[in-house]
Amino acid sequence: MTVATLKIKKGDTVQIITGKDRGLKGKVIRAYPEQNKVLVEGANRITRHTRVQQSARGSQSGGIVTQEAPIHVSNVMIVDPSDGRPTRIGYRINEDGTKVRISRRTGAEL
């Protein structure tokens, strides 16, 4: 089974287009290409109840922790750096042969 490459990479600024965090802009912390999901900072926060565990020094850690959960890539769009609006991603090959991502709306390089 082959894994499709994601057009959204770590460090990109994206906007959430559906769900409870719709309209929120954030930076991609991590990409999961095998699941087609991305982790966006400050978005899709969930609450986890962790069990209290003894550490080596005798301190206890546990309780209620809030953290980000991955979001499917179809629910986010990359933000165009030229005007700050969401756009689709295209590809162009430069004169030197390198493949670069471009904004479909403005044609600017991402």
Swiss-Prot record:
Gene designation: rplX
Organism: Frankia alni (strain DSM 45986 / CECT 9034 / ACN14a)
Record carries keyword Iron: no
Domain of life of the native organism: Bacteria
Keywords: Ribonucleoprotein, Ribosomal protein, RNA-binding, rRNA-binding
HAMAP family associated with the record: Ribosomal_uL24_B
Function noted in UniProt: One of two assembly initiator proteins, it binds directly to the 5'-end of the 23S rRNA, where it nucleates assembly of the 50S subunit. One of the proteins that surrounds the polypeptide exit tunnel on the outside of the subunit.
Subunit structure of this chain's protein: Part of the 50S ribosomal subunit.
Name of the protein described by the UniProt record: Large ribosomal subunit protein uL24
Record-linked InterPro entries: KOW, Rib_uL2_dom2, Ribosomal_uL24, Ribosomal_uL24_CS, Ribosomal_uL24_KOW, Translation_prot_SH3-like_sf
